[in-house]
């Protein structure tokens, strides 16, 4: 007896790092901010921040480097840099092929930008 496969009716994308290569922008923005205070943003610090909520990562950064800014101020500044950088993001391998395939089959595909929570078509 053949196995029935579920029918895909909708797809919601996480743009950051799935369809667009945005990860380097977070590092670039953070490095630019901490450099103003005489610090570098290295892997030992970044690895402690990955996977956490933005505010928790910001606290780790500010406290570890003893930056003279509040975590919220860092996030605000980083966000303004990301807004400038994101339009230059390159598609991840296979992203265009996947989105074109879904479009060809009429599957709605809204996407979400995780850093803002914005969902759009």
Predicted regions mapped to residue ranges:
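Short beta->alpha linker loops
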Residues: 25, 49-53, 77, 90-94, ...
